[in-house]
């Protein structure tokens, strides 16, 4: 793909620190090593000295915006790349003797046996220069390399971008918020954080933006560039590959736009990246969205609880094909109840008004999102069994002309965020009028997610329940089936309601026929000529 001159200029202005590293590495970062035997270290820490490839390999090292790109090819087939890895400041590596070098690349632990001492020393310098001369970014410090690799690979697929773009509520709300506040974008400099396909950047241009810097760390950046060029807006939008924590911009911006929300608002930890981007925001600048509200409510759903409980009971079998599985029942139960449930539900399963926790994107600090401690107090509106807590979020775009809300509430049209429910392994029975107190503790981890701890207590009693869940490993339960009303919500006989409705419709049809009009499917707009007992629709 050819890169436009405007994009090339933007990339050249990127990251002064990275440029200094490139100069320091050159020519070390652009070299090849032939005759390398590559071995693997297994999870059992066993070293297999036989090559994992059918012959010795050639390693090609070339500078990349993220560090040094390592390509592996066979010596006798250098036109075909077997594997690509990124050597970054986070790469773990160690020298083994005079010719071997151990390196941990993504999920692979490799030992490289070079053909000469000199080759090993040169490769070691490449790795050490990347590690020593390039400081770890905030993103790298908080994120495991394997998690980051998986994350950016996921968002590098067009199909995943399509999934988000086809979320009509999401995409249309963003467009309306931006176009409805064109005064905030007209002739302004805009930063799009985690631009993906660049759709929000295009909205900013539609609203009159003078310049948009679209930052995207995944391979989607190349597709965004293609869209920019094919839509002839390369003079307006500059696509910059890289992470906002690691790039440099040529100027401050008036507005930051982004779609940084994950499940339960905070999952994927993209909000921290969004807040980090404020270092490029001019005083009194705008952020779209401006703040987010996480809603939390206790819920009752015996069906969901039984479903998860029965799954775990698979491990309660004492004669599964002649094998006793019961020793794993406790761990199986723990694993299933550590999974947040992603689906949707009727809000009438909620037993109290939701508690709202606000995240202010204009003023909160990145560190504020490392540990989020939310106190809870619910005044119970209906007697029943509390099976856990339900979560959803709303975000507001506070513009100069109008405020626009994007909601993932169960009362709003469904989005690709759905809602999230966290179960209690030990549900608690609670009565109307009682007060349920406690806390939700979200502790960030290096897998770009959170460990979620729930503690609930019925005030004035000794009854309590708790659970810790892994937000990185949710259970996607949504099937597309219509949401069912919770049991016990009918205040009249559904059967009688149905027949009453049918009787009413029948009476209406009879009256229509007497008046010379035929009602079809309850709509009386057909005329009838009964001269010879034949109906003739007009």
From Swiss-Prot:
GO terms for molecular function: histone H3R17 methyltransferase activity; histone H3R2 methyltransferase activity; histone H3R26 methyltransferase activity; protein-arginine omega-N asymmetric methyltransferase activity; protein-arginine omega-N monomethyltransferase activity. It catalyses: L-arginyl-[protein] + 2 S-adenosyl-L-methionine = N(omega),N(omega)-dimethyl-L-arginyl-[protein] + 2 S-adenosyl-L-homocysteine + 2 H(+). S-adenosyl-L-methionine binds at residues 161, 170, 194, 216, 245, 273. It is an enzyme of class 2 (transferase). GO terms for biological process: chromatin remodeling; peptidyl-arginine methylation, to asymmetrical-dimethyl arginine; positive regulation of ecdysone receptor signaling pathway; positive regulation of transcription by RNA polymerase II; regulation of DNA-templated transcription. GO terms for cellular component: cytoplasm; cytosol; histone methyltransferase complex; nucleus. Its EC number is 2.1.1.319. Methylates (mono- and asymmetric dimethylation) the guanidino nitrogens of arginyl residues in proteins. May methylate histone H3 at 'Arg-17' and activate transcription via chromatin remodeling. PANTHER family: HISTONE-ARGININE METHYLTRANSFERASE CARMER-RELATED, PROTEIN ARGININE N-METHYLTRANSFERASE. This is Histone-arginine methyltransferase CARMER. The lineage of its organism: Eukaryota, Metazoa, Ecdysozoa, Arthropoda, Hexapoda.
């Amino acid at each position: 793909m050819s890169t436009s001159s405007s994009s090339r200029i933007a990339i050249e202005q990127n990251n002064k620190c990275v440029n200094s590293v490139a100069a320091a590495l050159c020519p070390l970062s652009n070299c090849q090593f032939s005759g390398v035997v590559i071995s693997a270290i297994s999870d059992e820490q066993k070293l297999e000295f036989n090559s994992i490839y059918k012959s010795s390999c050639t390693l090609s090292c070339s500078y990349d915006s993220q560090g040094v790109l390592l390509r592996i090819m066979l010596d006798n087939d250098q036109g075909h790349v077997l594997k690509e890895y990124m050597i970054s400041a986070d790469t773990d590596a160690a020298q083994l003797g005079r010719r071997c070098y151990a390196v941990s690349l993504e999920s692979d632990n490799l030992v490289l046996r070079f053909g000469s001492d000199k080759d090993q020393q040169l490769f070691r310098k490449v790795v050490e220069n990347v590690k020593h001369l390039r400081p770890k970014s905030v993103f790298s410090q908080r994120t495991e390399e394997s998690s980051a690799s998986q994350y950016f690979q996921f968002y590098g697929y067009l199909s995943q971008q399509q999934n988000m773009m086809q979320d009509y509520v999401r995409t249309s709300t963003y467009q309306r918020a931006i176009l409805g506040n064109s005064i905030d974008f007209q002739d302004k400099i805009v930063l799009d954080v985690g631009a993906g396909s660049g759709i929000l950047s295009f909205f900013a241009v539609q609203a009159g933006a003078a310049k948009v810097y679209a930052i995207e760390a995944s391979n989607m950046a190349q597709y965004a560039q293609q869209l920019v060029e094919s839509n002839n807006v390369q003079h307006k939008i500059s696509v910059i590959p890289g992470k906002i924590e690691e790039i440099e911009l040529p100027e401050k911006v008036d507005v930051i736009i982004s779609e940084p929300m994950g499940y339960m608002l905070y999952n994927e930890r993209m909000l921290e990246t969004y807040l980090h981007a404020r270092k490029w925001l001019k005083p009194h600048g705008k952020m779209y969205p401006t703040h987010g509200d996480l809603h939390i409510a206790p819920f009752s759903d015996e069906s969901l609880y039984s479903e998860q409980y029965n799954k775990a009971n698979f491990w309660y079998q004492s004669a599964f094909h002649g094998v006793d599985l019961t020793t794993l029942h406790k761990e199986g139960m723990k694993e299933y109840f550590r999974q947040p449930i992603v689906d949707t539900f009727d809000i009438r399963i909620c037993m109290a008004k939701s508690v709202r926790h606000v995240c202010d994107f204009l003023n909160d600090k990145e560190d504020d999102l490392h540990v989020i401690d939310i106190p809870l107090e619910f005044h119970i509106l209906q007697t029943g069994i509390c099976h856990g807590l339900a979560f959803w979020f709303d975000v507001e775009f506070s513009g100069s002309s109008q405020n626009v809300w994007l909601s993932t509430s169960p009362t709003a049209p469904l989005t690709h965020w759905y809602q999230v429910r966290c179960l209690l392994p030990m549900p608690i029975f609670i009565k109307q009028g009682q007060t349920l107190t406690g806390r939700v503790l979200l502790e960030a981890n290096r897998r770009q997610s959170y460990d979620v701890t729930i503690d609930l207590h019925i005030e004035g009693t000794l009854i309590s329940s708790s659970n810790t869940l892994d937000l990185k490993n949710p259970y996607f339960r949504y099937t597309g089936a219509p949401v069912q009303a919770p049991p016990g919500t009918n205040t009249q006989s559904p059967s009688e309601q149905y027949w009453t409705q049918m009787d009413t419709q029948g009476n209406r049809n009879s009256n229509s026929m007497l008046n010379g009009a035929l009602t079809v499917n309850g709509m009386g707009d057909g005329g009838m000529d009964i001269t010879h007992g034949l109906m003739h629709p007009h």
